[in-house]
Amino acid sequence: MDLGEVARAIIDGNRYMVLGTADEGGRPWVSPVYYAPSGYSDLYWVSSPDAQHSRNLAARRELSIVVFDSQAPVGEGQGVYMSAVAEQLMDADLERGIEIFSHVSVSHGARPWTLEDVQEPASLRLYRARVSEHWVLDPERRPDQRTRVRP
């Protein structure tokens, strides 16, 4: 079994990821967000800069991410676990990022997004996580044995 293929299928086949952030004191916080992948190392989402996870990222850019199918039968769950660094996008990165986010949004039957949706005076901003490491559960090494992969 190609575990990189497993990771690609999970990222391609889901629409929500869970961000694991921490504030300056190290207090953890998790948040599910709709995401738009660009390949398997750049993941985009929109959030309010006032949301707890956005405030945490402003103080500490490092985060963990998990994408999984919450409808999998008990005992058959699989996910992609990731380490990343995130930022609110500006300038050319914002222009490119909103194109990617909008394209994926439309492909999922949702509305298109524009720069006006993620700049002042709008209440949302566009964020990107740059993933440095991916892991999946190795079904040959249960229970919960994660194996690093390159999707």
Task: Give residue spans per PLM region.
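A generic "binding-loop/recognition-motif" signal
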Residues: 49-50, 132
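Alpha-helix boundary recognition
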Residues: 11-12, 58-59, 102, 119
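Short beta-strand segments
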Residues: 15-49, 57, 63-69, 77-82
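Charged, gly/pro-rich active-site loop segments
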Residues: 77-151
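Short, surface-exposed beta-strand-loop junctions and turns on beta-sheet-rich folds
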Residues: 51-53, 72, 142-144
